[in-house]
UniProtKB/Swiss-Prot annotation:
GO terms for biological process: translation. One of its GO terms (molecular function) is structural constituent of ribosome. Gene3D superfamilies: Glucose-6-phosphate isomerase like protein, domain 1. Belongs to the universal ribosomal protein uS2 family. Residues 1-78 are annotated as: Disordered. This is Small ribosomal subunit protein uS2.
Amino acid sequence: MSENDEGTDAAELDEELDELEDELEEDFEEPAAAADEADPTADEPPAEEAADEAADEAEADEPETDAEPADEEPVLDENVMPDDEADLLIPVEDYLAAGVHIGTQQKTKSMDRFIHRVRTDGLYVLDVSQTDQRIRTAASFLSNYQPEQILVASSRQYGRFPAEKFADAVGARARTGRFIPGTLTNPDYDGYIEPDVVVVTDPIGDSQAVKEAITVGIPVIAMCDSNNTTSNVDLVVPTNNKGRKALSVIYWLLANETLDRRGAEPAYALEDFETEP
């Protein structure tokens, strides 16, 4: 792993992550029991040819998986967190309007702690207060890195624009669309880079980026939905990671909170992160 600052080494990075874990009073690493669930990032690093094939398959599936999870008018008084008086970065109605809380009809063991309830239609509802807190934690973590040493990756269609906007806002690097195998692991590849931390939109769609981050030993921050497994994720941000509006809100908040923790004035509005439907 390349150095974050001149004085930062691998031991200090581990200590930093431990402090964040203590702050939230929970472990970021999932127990081995979660291994019985299919985890696309838990396999051994594939050969480059196999990785190319897997990336092509993921790209072919993209239009279907990027459909908005629910085409409905938001219910702005929906029950989405245990404490109705929780202090949030934005009004809870704004989270609801963007559908940040809307999970899938599948739930993994590793995401169970972030789920508030299940709706009558079978959709799991994510705890928005935990989403809000994890955005703050991720921003605090990212603010410790040199901007150019942060990499954000998003293969999902609806995550590409807000991910690129996030990179522009905080000075990070972005790799959107297909993640080319070897980007982090092959020094002979023209697009080879050595970031110190990776942010991904979805551990499934961005599995190649996650695998390479694991190989080179750098931490992974991931937007995770109710159907994700998190065994290879260091810091989970629980959110609807498929919806256009939800991803715009999450990346916007993460950018502004990161800038705020650097002592910079956040200068971006939500509209700057939104794409046309």
